[in-house]
Amino acid sequence: MGPVQKEQTREQVVARLISMLHQAHAMGAELVVYPELALTTFFPRWFVDDITQADHWYERNMPNAATQPLFDEAKRLGVGFCLGYAHLDERSDGTVHRWNVQTLVERDGSIVATYRKTHIPGHEHHEPDRPFQHAERYYFEPSPDGFGVSCAFGGIVGMAICNDRRWPETYRVMGLQGVELVLIGYNTPIHYVPDPSQDILQGFHNALVMQSGAYQNGTWVVGVAKGGVEEGVDSLCQSMIVAPSGQIVAQTLTSDDEVIVARCDLDWCAKYKDTLFDFDKYRRPEVYGRITSQRGAVLPD
């Protein structure tokens, strides 16, 4: 998906999403995956002292008046979709939570699941020396739920968001639940402020982590970018569909709204799950204790 500028309304963005839905349907797609924070610009690039001044970037309900046309048209066409957005979770006890989420919708229009982002990157406080902010840790809480999967679209489907894709635990936790299709939306600035030497490697790293996650868990991975120049910040494009073999079977070529399609044969997953990555036969969880017992590295004496 191409950039969403600050002045664009949700209604304008939803019209773009519906246009891509029509293109995908004409190409035979049964499931359309949209990127992280698809309905708005990537607002964590700005910092506001009063976080409630950013509430207009969040959705309180899904669907809502702006997104209902997408839900209606998808149901009419018999096409499911996965949509990323910011969720303002106002609870009856008066607490307010802010999540970065993806909602998976089946072909009949029913909501299958909503996933909350687990690995929140960036910083919590204003860093005025940056050319732009990446204040996700200010605007979003990390998920308390982790990585679940759902039976949908004739298989076992899981979700992840942006920075989640860089962590092998993301794929493995879902792999241990038999996942066959992982849906990932992302916004990735090409300029990485903490270490600009990584800028030139953004595309390489993007493919590396999704191809590795697919292969090592015998699953399809669909990674979808909101890329291009958005409010002066250039973000990675390179949406791709990765097979359980780790091979890229389709990839976007532009920084505009673009639709790619692949036939994802879920039976292909068994070629890896039942052989080299037969978890029950080959895994050694008794020696993996450090993965869950500690957070940071503990160096040897």
Model-predicted regions and their roles:
Residues 104-106, 242-243, 262-263:
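Short beta-strand-to-turn element immediately C-terminal to the catalytic PLP-Schiff-base lysine
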Residues 267-301:
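A short C-terminal boundary segment appended to hydrolase-like catalytic domains
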Residues 1-7:
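Generic N-terminal amphipathic, Lys/Arg-enriched alpha-helix
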Residues 89-194, 198-208, 274-278:
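Active-site catalytic loop in hydrolytic enzyme cores
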Residues 59-82, 156, 162-259:
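CN hydrolase (nitrilase-like) catalytic-core segments centered on the catalytic cysteine
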Residues 8-108, 112-116, 122-123, 188-212, ...:
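Cys-nucleophile CN-hydrolase/nitrilase-fold catalytic domain and related Cys-dependent amidase chemistry
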Residues 2, 251-271:
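A hydrophobic, small-residue-rich beta->alpha segment in the mid-to-C-terminal subdomain
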Residues 115, 150, 224, 252, ...:
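Hydrophobic residues at beta-strand termini and immediately following loops
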